Amino acid sequence: MNPASAPPPLPPPGQQVIHVTQDLDTDLEALFNSVMNPKPSSWRKKILPESFFKEPDSGSHSRQSSTDSSGGHPGPRLAGGAQHVRSHSSPASLQLGTGAGAAGSPAQQHAHLRQQSYDVTDELPLPPGWEMTFTATGQRYFLNHIEKITTWQDPRKAMNQPLNHMNLHPAVSSTPVPQRSMAVSQPNLVMNHQHQQQMAPSTLSQQNHPTQNPPAGLMSMPNALTTQQQQQQKLRLQRIQMERERIRMRQEELMRQEAALCRQLPMEAETLAPVQAAVNPPTMTPDMRSITNNSSDPFLNGGPYHSREQSTDSGLGLGCYSVPTTPEDFLSNVDEMDTGENAGQTPMNINPQQTRFPDFLDCLPGTNVDLGTLESEDLIPLFNDVESALNKSEPFLTWL
């Protein structure tokens, strides 16, 4: 057999071999198509181990039937396939014993959700008309043949509850919830749907029958507290009124004392004003302060102790200009310098800073002479010249 005529070997699964020796254009297009649009291949054609296509023989190695809680015994497998419900978990096996017993009955899987603990009320007899029965799963419920109701709640617990007004509200809110769940899970136990809806009010009325007196006593407590609060408020109001009366009497007494002092010392009112201004703020009210100021302050009341004197240095009547005044200290120094007996003592007694003339003399127009170097005899004719120049009536003045 000619090796050249032998067929080419088959490519491995998942691969495609294209020969480009015959038609380059067509084969090159097929190469791009095979890359851009690969053909789906079967799982059987892929290189996979044989165990991938075989189902497990037993459930000992699977997650659905773990042996960590069944004591090494594989759990039973349902006919429909793998068991997805983990009924052999550790909590279930610890509570119900073995895994086989837990999976025997589907109804017993939820038996551990509601367990009845021991209670002292179990030893007490049921009230008249009540009967206790059990369901198929062992849960007990109570029948009231008088009112035709069915409930999960033990009527003996309501009788032994302490007489507390605050504990009745949680019982009201939590009673209808287990009854509705009972109606859904065990519909054959509900004798009448209408009586079931009325069960909560009727049961509460029967439970609250022996506890009518304590709420009445509790309702009277707010009234007693309110009365006590009213008495405290009255006492507090009386104390405030008495304190206000004492303050008013003290204010009147201070006003009388002040008026008496003002009558005794009318001429010294000006000297008392600063003292009163320092004493009045911490001890007297604003009303009293206004009265005090009006009666004793000479600058505000306009009384007989003070009159407005005529001002001689305000420049009234001088037109649009004003004559600068000579300070009193300066004139007193001039008088002392003119006296003959004090002429020898003047250089020693007068302070050099006090002999310095005021600054406004330097600002006068037309005076380019240092006024600080002039003597008193030279200043007198200078002031006369300035005054005569200011008193001229010419509208236009020429300063030299």
UniProtKB/Swiss-Prot annotation:
Keywords: Activator, Cell junction, Cell membrane, Coiled coil, Cytoplasm, Isopeptide bond, Membrane, Nucleus, Phosphoprotein, Proto-oncogene, Tight junction, Transcription, Transcription regulation, Ubl conjugation. A motif (PDZ-binding) lies at residues 394-400. SUPFAM superfamilies: WW domain. Its main location: nucleus. Residues 225-259 form a coiled coil. GO terms for cellular component: bicellular tight junction; cytoplasm; cytosol; nuclear body; nucleoplasm; nucleus; plasma membrane; transcription regulator complex. GO terms for biological process: cilium assembly; glomerulus development; heart process; hippo signaling; kidney morphogenesis; mesenchymal cell differentiation; multicellular organism growth; negative regulation of canonical Wnt signaling pathway. Phosphorylated by LATS2 and STK3/MST2. Phosphorylation by LATS2 results in creation of 14-3-3 binding sites, retention in the cytoplasm, and functional inactivation. Phosphorylation results in the inhibition of transcriptional coactivation through YWHAZ-mediated nuclear export. Phosphorylated in the nucleus by PRP4K; phosphorylation leads to nuclear exclusion. Residues 61-70 have a biased composition (Polar residues). InterPro entries: WW_dom (IPR001202), WW_dom_sf (IPR036020), YAP1 (IPR051583). The keyword Acetylation does not apply. Residues 124-157 form the WW domain. There is a cross-link at residue 46 (Glycyl lysine isopeptide (Lys-Gly) (interchain with G-Cter in ubiquitin)). One of its GO terms (molecular function) is transcription coactivator activity. It is found in: Nucleus; Cytoplasm; Cell membrane; Cell junction, Tight junction. The modification Phosphoserine is found at residues 62, 89, 105, 295, 311. Residues 52-117 are annotated as: Disordered. It holds the Pfam family WW. The PDZ-binding motif is essential for stimulated gene transcription. It localizes the protein into both punctate nuclear foci and plasma membrane-associated complexes. PANTHER family: WW DOMAIN-CONTAINING TRANSCRIPTION REGULATOR PROTEIN 1, YES-ASSOCIATED PROTEIN YAP1 FAMILY MEMBER. This is WW domain-containing transcription regulator protein 1. It comes from Homo sapiens.
